[in-house]
Amino acid sequence: MKANFGGIKMQLEHPSVKTIEEVENPAARRVQYGSLIGLLVLLGCYFLLEYRGNGVAWTWMEVYSVIPAMLFMGATLSGGLTRPVRNRLIFGAAFLIWFAVTKALHRIEGVEARSIGVFFCAYGMCLPFAWASGDGKRRRGLKWILGLYLGLGALLVLYGLMLLGGCVPGYLRDAVYWDGTRFSAMSHPNVCAPLLMIGIGVSLMCWGRLNKVWQRVLLILWIGVQFGVLILTSARTTIVFTCVLLGGSLFCALRKSGWKRFAIACLAAVVLMGGLFVGSQMLSKVHKTNMEASQTAGEIKNIQYGWGSDIKNLNNRTEIWSSARKGLRDNPRILLEGTEYSGLILSQYNSFRVYHAHNSWLQVLYDMGLPGLLLALVLTVVVVYDALVLLWYNPEPMKSVAALLVLCILGCSFLEPYLFGAYMEKQPIQFLFLLLSGYLDCWRAELRKSK
């Protein structure tokens, strides 16, 4: 099967990647796609229904997301398993088994196990979906979930505009509000921000499908609006990586063969990233000044330091990581089985309340011990390798943007526990990350076969 992208024909054939018509059991494929639709319905309810904390949508996600995952696993195991599918199922099963073991050990100690369903869904369904469903070329499931996250970006923009205009409905005021001077939705500004970054990334993936100038102009304006709402969250790490995402996408679009075009693409990307970063800081200062002028000192609950302080201690992250090291030193049992009390342990070693380690890999060490950290590192290496290969060959804009988005999510996870854990409010980020990771692996295999 051949595909034409921008006039460049590529052969996209790989023996392990089968379409729904080519498999021995098309009924199993329909169940796999149906399972993804079930997850999308749960995610859609989770995104729409506010306030979610201990509410119906939160419960649906936490309890019932295991159902589509189990249906998917059953359909996958009922069909023929190629080696890539088998390898990813084994890796996901290893992650799930160790997660279950640690939760069982914690349960023996009297701690209630939670979020098992969403973790099972993440590693039992989202990670192997692209290979197991043979969707690497058709991308039907990918289009569905990207459409959902595109709608989420629009929803967050609507929330931000309503908050700026002071017209948030009463039933949303507990979920959409100013956290000090920061725009907060989806439970916290630091959760809202990466979801907006994902919305921007999905919008960039649509670029190659728009052929008319006015369509692309509207898309640029829409991305600008999302970036403006992202600035309101004051999530500086996410803002930086969103600038990298936009600049990297421009680089991939302009990059051609030859050193001159390569240099021009690099220069354009650097100028765009620098301009966006400087502009975001200027707008953030103006917004903060206006908010502080309109609110009393008692209403400003959230205080953030300037960039000068952030460069020195990464907004207190270095102190938190030092506390995590001391906690591991004084509680070596964590290295074996993890703990449910990471926040309490970390708070003993610093002067402020800490709920987690503010690093995905350090947090998974606290949650699941060294075996969990090893599995997370293996997945990280594979994902980074797949993304870098796709960026190097730059086969088509959508794939390059997907690779950039995955790397940017990893970058944000260096300062927040977005990945590898069982925090409910962060599962939408992890779902998309793992799903995209599977597609990147499929596309890298296709690219290798075509060479």
Question: Each predicted region: which residue ranges?
Answer:
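N-terminal signal-anchor transmembrane segment
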Residues: G6, Q11-G79, I97-H106, Y159, ...
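Transmembrane alpha-helical segments and their membrane-water interfaces
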Residues: M70-L81, T102-G160, G199-V202, G411
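Alpha-helical transmembrane segments of multi-pass inner-membrane proteins
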Residues: K143-Y171, M186-R255, V382
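A membrane-periplasm/extracellular boundary helix in multi-pass inner-membrane enzymes
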Residues: L158, A253-W307, S322, K326-R329
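Transmembrane alpha-helices of multi-pass inner-membrane enzymes
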Residues: L246, V401-K451
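Hydrophobic transmembrane alpha-helices and their immediate junctions
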Residues: F251, W259, D367-L410
